[in-house]
Regions:
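Active-site-proximal region of nucleotide-activated glycan assembly enzymes
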Residues: 123-127, 131, 151, 163-238
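A short, glycine/small-residue-rich beta-strand->loop->alpha-helix junction that serves as a flexible
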Residues: 8-20, 150, 262-265, 436
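Nucleotide-activated donor-dependent transferases that construct or modify glycoconjugates
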Residues: 1-12, 39-40, 61-63, 254-258
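Short N-terminal targeting/anchoring amphipathic segment
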Residues: 94, 137-156, 340-346
């Protein structure tokens, strides 16, 4: 009997992986048990949804406790070595803009060094020195997995399990959680035996940034978007608008803020849009405000406006950070994107999902009523590596003022087919073919590996 150990870092991994064909395909492996390792959470609900006696086992080891100072130090060391513009923007936000110039220059030095092979080799030596939580080690020794599958390669538990497996000469398969992971979160401190990436850009990033062997990379697409290819993905229009308490006969703007941490002037922009719905600038128009599941936004204070409906997606457990997305939530998002006339956001991956449904999408490149320099402005977000290919297609225009925003909204409402081809290119650049099979392709990487294990 072979064993595949899969740590489940958070609810996003559950949504993006377990609720796709990934697990269903993986369960077809003969003489193989699959262990889903929860850090914390409701074991009973996971067993009810995913468990299969003697086949899919749910384990909860309580190993996701707050990292100690040593772990935080190691984590920061690797994180700041990600050699990208994305990381530079973060370092400016975290340090330079707060007057912490010493920390900025120190972290920038790590980022510059991160491009060099000799530095990456040094980091792997450093990585081997990080203490491993005894609970993680106990889980590994309990199951002695033949394969460790790391769905994000970011969490400290995943990194520890990858280390233990490599030391034990077992197979490690890593996966880039989303199309921005390799440039923002997942410094490849450990080279897995196989690396799953969503697109060809991910291949270029793994090879170019981290000198990862190209022949060990597998391109699968993005599993969490598989549901968008299913026939029952979209709710009927009348049913959807009844659910969100909006008028199906009006034009609908979906406003999707990423949270005040990313754009603290969203409330100013949304406030102006609501004013436009009251006069002849945007007649017969309503707004659906879709808050981020985990981040606060001052836009919520506009709740109560007659042309606004507010929702926060997902099921939350005590606070915003602990939440779950089930298939109904995913289908609701798909229906929201499909039935909206225009989507507005700030540098969010939601722009890609809008393009999948060929819904006109506008992204904000100005800061409400405030004039800010580049390094303080939301305009900087569009220099991040994962968004550059999307913006370059021309399918997602950047509004640089209130006037441009109003003109774009009016233009798209009047002519929704405008930039259809460009939106197709944007979706393909990130997702490849949306055929509903990305989860199965990711699982097949594991199945092929299991076949090679004696």
């Amino acid at each position: 009997m072979k064993t595949v150990l899969i740590p489940i870092h958070d609810g996003t991994v559950t949504k993006n992986l377990l609720r796709t064909d990934f697990l269903a395909t993986l369960k077809t492996a003969p003489n193989t048990k699959i262990v889903l390792l929860l850090g914390s959470g409701d074991v009973a609900s996971y067993e009810a949804e995913f468990g299969v006696p003697e086949k899919v086992i749910v384990e909860c080891a309580q190993v996701y406790n707050r990292a100690d100072k040593v772990e935080l130090l190691f984590s920061s060391f690797f994180k700041h070595s990600i050699p990208t513009m994305f990381m530079k923007i973060r370092q400016v936000d975290w340090y330079w803009n707060k007057g912490k110039y010493g920390l900025y220059f120190g972290s920038s030095l790590l980022r510059v060094c991160g491009r060099f092979r000799i530095w990456q080799q040094f980091l792997r030596i450093v990585n081997a020195l990080e203490p491993i939580d005894p609970k993680v080690r106990a889980v590994y020794e309990k199951w002695h997995p033949d394969v460790v599958f790391a769905p994000t390669m970011v969490s400290r538990v995943e990194v520890a399990l990858m280390r233990l497996a490599q030391k034990d000469k077992k197979v490690v398969i890593g996966m880039a959680k989303s199309f921005d992971n390799l440039t923002s979160k997942a410094y490849l401190r450990i080279h897995p035996d196989y690396l799953i990436v969503p697109n060809q850009t991910g291949t270029q990033e793994a090879v170019g940034l981290y000198h990862y062997p190209k022949e060990q990379i597998r391109v699968t697409g993005i599993p969490q978007y598989d549901v968008y290819a299913t026939a029952d993905c979209i709710e009927e229009r009348i049913q959807f608008f009844e659910k969100v308490n909006l008028d199906p006969n009006k034009k609908t703007i979906l406003y999707a803020p990423a949270g005040d941490w990313m754009n603290d002037t969203d409330h100013e922009v949304l406030g102006e849009i609501l004013k436009w719905t009251e006069d002849d600038k945007l007649p017969n128009t309503q707004v659906l405000l879709r808050l981020h599941p985990t981040y606060e936004s001052k836009t919520e204070k506009l709740k109560g406006h007659p042309n606004l409906y507010v929702e926060r997606p997902g099921t939350h457990f005590g606070n915003l950070k602990r939440y779950q997305f089930d298939l109904n939530d995913v289908r609701h998002l798909a229906s929201t994107l499909y039935h909206s006339d225009v989507v507005i956001n700030t540098g969010s991956t939601l722009m890609v999902e809008s393009c999948i449904f060929d819904t006109p999408v506008i992204t904000l490149g100005f800061d409400g009523y405030t004039k800010r320099g580049y390094w303080q402005s939301v305009a900087r977000y569009y220099s991040r590596e994962h968004l550059v290919p999307v913006i370059n297609t021309g399918g997602v225009p950047i509004a640089k003022s209130f006037e441009e925003l109003q003109n774009l909204i009016t233009t798209y409402i009047a002519n929704p087919e405008l930039h259809t081809e460009e939106r197709k290119k944007a979706a393909f650049a990130v997702c490849g073919e949306i055929d509903g099979k990305a989860g199965a392709r990711a699982a097949n990487v594991v199945l092929q590996t299991l076949q090679q294990i004696k």
